Amino acid sequence: STGINMAESPLKQKITASMKDAMRAKDKPRLGAIRLALSDIKQVEVDERIDPDDARIITILDKMVKQRRESIRQYGAAERQELADLEQQEIEVLQEFLPQALSEIELAELIEKAITETGAENMKDMGKVMGIVRPQVVGRADMSAVSAEVKSLLG
């Protein structure tokens, strides 16, 4: 695609504008994280031949945050704190483009509501509950924590 793409999502425009700001400010760590995000978005555009909307971009960024959390765990185990710190900086930059994180209370309320709506009673119903919760929390909560919370309530 050439020139200005009218279908470009507002979120992608915001990320691109932030990249330009980081370049002007010569903020290398921030610029690096933003370029990685744009690169992952571009990869989806090429692979799937789509212009991802905001929701799809949030999913991409959320996956990037998850990967970095996993890296931090591994670096922590290997006692490589400086590398863990770099990953944490990237997470902080990526989170600027994600919706406001849910509080534990908001998350618990969403899960309780989904359990009530589905009439879920035990672990067999977990898929139904997650099916309702997932779209509401993507990019706003750590899915492994959400899953653990649902398990504890249904278990």
Give residue spans per PLM region.
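Charged, compositionally biased, marginally structured helical/coil segments
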Residues: 5-155
